Each structure stands twice: as structure tokens, then as C-alpha cells.
Amino acid sequence: MALSKNNLKEYRENAKLNLKISDVAATSFVTLYCHAIESQSNDPILNDPKAVEITNELNKILSNSENKLYQDLVNGKLKKELVTHIAIRARQYDRYVNDFLRDSPEGVVVNIGCGLDSRFLRIDNGKVIFYDLDLPEVIEIKKQFFEENDRYHFISSSVLDHEWMSMVAEHEGPFLFVAEGVFMYLNQEDVQSLILTLQSEFPGSELVCEVFNSLWLKEPLRSIMNFKLQRQLHLGKDAIFNFGIRDSKEMETWNTGIEFLDDWSYFDSDEEKLGWIKIFGWIEFIRKTQWTVHYKLN
């Protein structure tokens, strides 16, 4: 059951237990707060009132924490550029889902590494079957703010424990798997195993996932990225990027039948809030530092 006034006090009293989450899981708070901040800005890129509601409640809990990341979130100390990028990304992933549902209104969507995102509320067409998948500690928090129904379900599991697929496989499909800001924290062997299993278990499904340029995983660029994640964003030591690719079509080489459909970068957006940084979009290395690929898993 979602959080109500009657159980809010109890939830706050137990908050220290509920908020003991891994470094990688804590990144979901950054995404959530970016959504909330942008939603309250002038001419917002993303309209996410649920994020505003959740952060208003979390502020009452996180304000008592000595965690530097949590203090930054409560005090709104997130860089404007980060907020803009996260909001543009969420809007684009919503568009991917809406495009899928336009062709398959009763399709099945699995939001891998969902965090506290309210994508289901933003894209619900009244027919979609939607699964939010994330680590148990994240889903436990999410249950305080969202309610499941006959078309909206939680899966409390690591994406690497492939047993979660049996629940999704109960449906006929078609299937769309989205992984926004997830794969870069995993190892290549795990990402490859996951995608090959999705291809085997859900033939004909689509995958939309964010990827990172593997060149940035080599020194000295790797140290620069880790500095940004841990010293500037104050994420934990385990929240580091491990997986990357060089080319949008690279996953096609993993197995016959993996078909590249398209890709997307922040620089493809005509959003005015990107500002001067848009001038670097013509540089391929910059455009594809962190971007999104779309595949058909035949």
C-alpha cells in the first residue's frame, strides 16, 4: 500500500532501516530529485508530479542524515546541467515506450533498474502491462509511494538473477525492456549474459538501454569519471562505471539475430535548456560518451 498520513509517522521512524541501500541503488535518488527539480522549473522538460510528492516526503527523512549525497539532494545542490540531462533522458525513454505502445497497446514493458521513477504513471494507456524491476531495498522504498494493480507490478530482484524473467514470460507479449542508467554499473559478462538470455526467452522483443563509451573506462579518463561520480556527486565507492561499448552496433556481434534499430544522444535533442553544450554535438566522441541504443532481439 502506498504511503498514507496514518502510516507516515511509522515510516519515518523506520526510515534509517529502509534507506540502508547500496551505492548503486542510491543513484536512483539522484534521478528522482532531478525529475522533481525539473518538474518545478519554468517550462519543464519533464512533468513528474509524483517525483515532487516523493521528494517532499523524503526530505523530511534525509534532512536528518549525515550522508553528503542526501544533504546535497535535500538542499537542491545538483548541477543544472545534470538535472537537464536526466530530464531529457527520461522524456526520451518515455517516448520510446509510447512509440512501442502505439504499435502494441497491450504490450508488456519491463523497466529494468526502475529506481523510484514513476514511468508507469506517465505512459499508462489503460492497457499496458508494466513491470518495475529493481533491487529489493529499492522496491521496499518504492512500495511506500506506489501501489501495484492488475497491470502494474513490482519485481524485487537483481536483474542478474534471471529467475525474474519467469514472471514476465507468463504474458504473450510483445515485450519491451528498457534500462535507463543501469548497464554501465555492471560487468560486460553480466550485460552480455542478460541480453542473450532476453533474446532466448523473449524472441522478437525490443531492448532500449543506455550505454557508455568504453574509451572512458581506460586511464586517465576512468579516473576523471570516478572523480565526477564520487567527489562531485558524492556517490559511494561502488557506484562506478564498468561496462561500455565503442559503437552503437557493437551488440550485434554478440549473437545472430540481435538487430540494431537506432540510437539516441542528448545532443540529438533540440531542447533549449542544453544551452551552449549543444555545439559539441557534432564531435562523435562527445556525442557518444553516454548514449542510448535500441535493438530488436530476434
Features from the language model and the residues they span:
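Rossmann-like AdoMet
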Residues: 2-110, 114-155, 171
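Short amphipathic alpha-helix with an adjacent loop that forms part of the alpha/beta core around
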Residues: 162-172
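A short SAM/SAH-binding and catalytic strip from SAM-dependent methyltransferases
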Residues: 174-189
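A short, conserved alpha-helix within the catalytic core of class I
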Residues: 185-201
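Conserved beta-strand signature within the Rossmann-like core of class I S-adenosyl-L-methionine
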Residues: 198-215
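Short, glycine-/aromatic-enriched active-site segment of Class I SAM-dependent methyltransferases
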Residues: 221-238
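Short alpha-helix
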Residues: 238-265
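Core SAM-dependent methyltransferase catalytic element
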Residues: 266, 275-298
